[in-house]
A protein has these predicted regions:
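Catalytic phosphate/metal-binding cores of nucleic-acid and nucleotide-processing enzymes, i.e., regions
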Residues: 1-140
Length: 140
């Protein structure tokens, strides 16, 4: 009968493979490095991930581990909690707030509001006014 330690290692390695396989939708070279190896848990991606499948919760230690391997990449942790199956989309992910804001500002920058040229309502520049549905952009 396999030991509990072997079961945990197998679960950790399986979780790394599940996450790597899920990431292949966007990063076709994503590969799990295998449980227990030093360095990044998944290679072939533009960020550093530490994958955890554990019952204890040590977020600060885990993020420090991810950061120690990051080599200039943004680091984060993917955590498979007890009771979660093998759907990586459902796993938790966390990172430092400063790193998250860098990503969010690229995707959704804080644009200053301006007045719509048609109705005078507030809107974000170069977008459609939510009041008159026209405004700051050319609809032609």
């Amino acid at each position: 009968m396999p030991s509990m330690a072997n079961h945990r290692k197998h679960r950790g390695y399986k979780t790394q493979r599940v996450v790597a396989d899920w990431l292949k939708q966007w990063y076709p070279y994503a590969e799990s490095t295998g449980a227990g190896r030093q360095g990044e848990d998944i290679t072939g991606i533009p960020f550093s991930i530490e994958v955890k499948a554990r019952s204890d919760f040590q977020p600060l230690a885990w993020i420090k581990q991810a950061e120690s391997n990051k080599g200039g990449k943004i680091a984060f942790v993917v955590s498979r909690c007890n009771g979660q199956g093998e759907n990586a989309e459902e796993y938790l992910a966390f990172m430092r707030l400063g790193d998250l804001m860098k990503i969010l500002q690229e995707r959704a920058p804080n644009n200053e509001p301006t007045r719509c040229k048609q109705c005078g309502g507030w809107m974000i520049e170069n977008s459609i006014c939510h009041t008159c549905h026209q405004g700051g952009i050319s609809l032609a």
